[in-house]
Amino acid sequence: MHPHISKLYNSALKPSRLIIGLMSGTSLDGLDVALCKITAAGVHTQIEVLKFTTVDYSDDYKTKIKQVFAKRECNLEYLTLLHPWVGKFHGDMVNQCLNSWQVNPANIDVIASHGQTIYHCPKSQHQYNDFNNGTLQIGDSDQIAVTTGITTIGDFRQKHIAAGGEGAPLAVYGDYLFFSSSDENRILLNMGGIANLTFLPQNGDSNAVFSSDIGPCNTIMDAYVQRYFNNMHYDENAAIAKAGFINTALLTALCDNHFLTLKMPKTTGPEVFNLAYLEAAQQASNTQKLSHQDVMATLNRFTAEVIANALNTCVKMAPNSVVYASGGGIHNLLLMQHLVTLCPAIKGFKNTHALGVDPDAKEAVLFAILANECLAGEQLHLDNKAQGIAGVTMGKVSFAD
């Protein structure tokens, strides 16, 4: 037996494993790095987040990614070079974290890397007859493995597509395994660049569980701030939005979109919801001369209404649901206030701290769970193709030499 296979086998047999989860979202804020102690697998999974940090991305990194990110046409040579470069870059960040945490890399069983999404393209979006769903994440896991000396599991989304899914959202697997409850109906709401949710009814019926993208959360607001406000990456404390007024005409135009009418589950991305989308809505509503503050106030409300529509759909199926939110959007208190107002049937809004997981770390933790399932799990019992959930083992293994 090859030593690498033997080591993986021994890791799988251990009662608990140390797994580093990596997540780099479409907001391009930074690399989330979560060191997790994961005990058991499947529905018996238990997690302790030992260390967590977000390593901020430099402007240089963001500039490089934005040259190809969510673009239908880009420089193929540049994209080819970015793939290994991002992997090496992420590997260096992991080494920095291990050094600062004073953790020996030899003690880590595996790294779980999501990579950097460059383009997400479900069939409902591209409309080509000859092709099904597609998604592309860069950041070669071989580069991470070689740079850190740690076996790396990555490229999780491709198996989901191979099994007939859209490659997203994958949160449902970890949410179901770790956050399901027999005491209450739960909605796990992730408020990143794109908002998505996982619906977890308390009856535990896996056929009723689903996960879906909802629509834009931070993606358009952040892009607008970055274009029109120097040296600002997002609307801190919603200060810009609070200084403006909601424009009804623009709000109506923003809400007029085919994706928003589709039933869940569905997926989307910044390929659809971006500044060009906003500009088209402004033109359609003759609101090009609005102040930046009014635009941001309207975008904030638009985001809230899109998310609220999805939450209210869920609560009709499961009364008294409790929402557990995570992601950068939870820090936008104006957005959260809108959600509370628009969702009176929701029993409560909390963040995942209440469930023992830092809301900023949740996605990195979820990919650590997927790696744990790849390594030590059994056949996944969550298999509901009608809801876009394939009962498959995800992840590709990259050895360190």
Swiss-Prot record:
It catalyses: 1,6-anhydro-N-acetyl-beta-muramate + ATP + H2O = N-acetyl-D-muramate 6-phosphate + ADP + H(+). Catalyzes the specific phosphorylation of 1,6-anhydro-N-acetylmuramic acid (anhMurNAc) with the simultaneous cleavage of the 1,6-anhydro ring, generating MurNAc-6-P. Is required for the utilization of anhMurNAc either imported from the medium or derived from its own cell wall murein, and thus plays a role in cell wall recycling. Its EC number is 2.7.1.170. This is Anhydro-N-acetylmuramic acid kinase. InterPro entries: Anhydro_N_Ac-Mur_kinase (IPR005338), ATPase_NBD (IPR043129). The keyword Lipid biosynthesis does not apply. ATP binds at G25, T26, S27, L28, D29, G30, L31, D32. It comes from Pseudoalteromonas translucida (strain TAC 125). The keyword ATP-binding applies. It holds the Pfam family AnmK. The lineage of its organism: Bacteria, Pseudomonadati, Pseudomonadota, Gammaproteobacteria, Alteromonadales. Belongs to the anhydro-N-acetylmuramic acid kinase family. GO terms for molecular function: ATP binding; kinase activity; phosphotransferase activity, alcohol group as acceptor. HAMAP family: AnhMurNAc_kinase (MF_01270). NCBIfam families: PRK09585.3-4. One of its GO terms (biological process) is 1,6-anhydro-N-acetyl-beta-muramic acid catabolic process. Keywords: ATP-binding, Carbohydrate metabolism, Kinase, Nucleotide-binding, Transferase. Pathway: Amino-sugar metabolism; 1,6-anhydro-N-acetylmuramate degradation; Cell wall biogenesis; peptidoglycan recycling.
